[in-house]
Swiss-Prot record:
Function statement: Involved in late steps of the endosomal multivesicular bodies (MVB) pathway. Recognizes membrane-associated ESCRT-III assemblies and catalyzes their disassembly, possibly in combination with membrane fission. Redistributes the ESCRT-III components to the cytoplasm for further rounds of MVB sorting. MVBs contain intraluminal vesicles (ILVs) that are generated by invagination and scission from the limiting membrane of the endosome and mostly are delivered to lysosomes enabling degradation of membrane proteins, such as stimulated growth factor receptors, lysosomal enzymes and lipids.
Protein known as: Vacuolar protein sorting-associated protein 4B
Source organism phylogeny: Eukaryota, Metazoa, Chordata, Craniata, Vertebrata
UniProt keyword Membrane, yes or no: yes
Protein origin, superkingdom: Eukaryota
Subcellular location: Late endosome membrane
EC id: 3.6.4.6
Amino acid sequence: MSSTSPNLQKAIDLASKAAQEDKAGNYEEALQLYQHAVQYFLHVVKYEAQGDKAKQSIRAQCTEYLDRAEKLKEYLKNKEKKAQKPVKEGQPSPADEKGNDSDGEGESDDPEKKKLQNQLQGAIVIERPNVKWSDVAGLEGAKEALKEAVILPIKFPHLFTGKRTPWRGILLFGPPGTGKSYLAKAVATEANNSTFFSISSSDLVSKWLGESEKLVKNLFQLARENKPSIIFIDEIDSLCGSRSENESEAARRIKTEFLVQMRGVGVDNDGILVLGATNIPWVLDSAIRRRFEKRIYIPLPEPHARAAMFKLHLGTTQNSLTEADFRELGRKTDGYSGADISIIVRDALMQPVRKVQSATHFKKVRGPSRADPNHLVDDLLTPCSPGDPGAIEMTWMDVPGDKLLEPVVSMSDMLRSLSNTKPTVNEHDLLKLKKFTEDFGQEG
């Protein structure tokens, strides 16, 4: 390279500082600095170094620093168990001479393992989400499969003995906004004896070299210690996409660790269910896809499920909609996902507020008192048209805070919001999902 790039200079500075800390006996600080320096060196090799000779030289330096980092790691690991003479730079550590015992009894006292497990503790859902099966409209096939995989083995363990074993991996796939994550919340609520781990890719990806796969390993270790347990990985495609020549070494290592932990030789996953969710299942690595024994398509809701969603999202809000109105809304929203319907209802719930804001006239009506809803009063004010009998010219600013009676949500509010909200799922994605279902999945 003609001149030293900022990244290369940073790597050199870090390595120099690491060597100083190493000589001073500050081994923990030195280890962090060596690892950090290697990250910068690898970045330079990948994106900045010109010519094979420069790359070869940097790689050789990296190997040297990594070897030293490993020796320091071994020393720090054994430090708590026995007083041991610090290793001089360039000398082999006692762990090299006596054999690596990191897989033996000392692993439970491994400070690094504890740190990684503490990092994952936040992923354990301690408070159960309050989502019942009845709160999930439609998706009967998916609900039955999840009950079969999660609820039945906990309630009737004697049913699942011998060759009859519960499912260990279930993949929920489908268009965005169809309730995949919501179903996982229902599982967490209903499986009240299970430990529920809700994981996203950010929980498992680390900037430090080699730490991401350790996080994956420790996640499964935590799940085994707290079984029966459910590991829910949202947007699993971001962690386990198809392997290619262009992917980074870190991504490949995460994938390999997932494969080993989900069903590797000598791995005991009894009592552990891995639940994955994705909108783009065709990008998943084929080996990862095979680990998910059940692949359930979560489709766009049917008309009856859409009608039920309108009802669920309205909740206890005052409205004038009839059963026939809900059925009509279900028919009019073909191609809309559950999330789209949620947005329509939220917008419709704001329509009465907009009427209050834009009203130029209000009239007095009878209604429940704000102080005591069981007591009716005659001096509440509600928006009206200027021609209404008893209309008083005023704006919402003139209405006392406890005297406003907002209009109820009506069918016309729903239709107005529906006309302003377009579906978020396109036909092209639906065709790809349908093809994937035909090839690898089952209908939910």
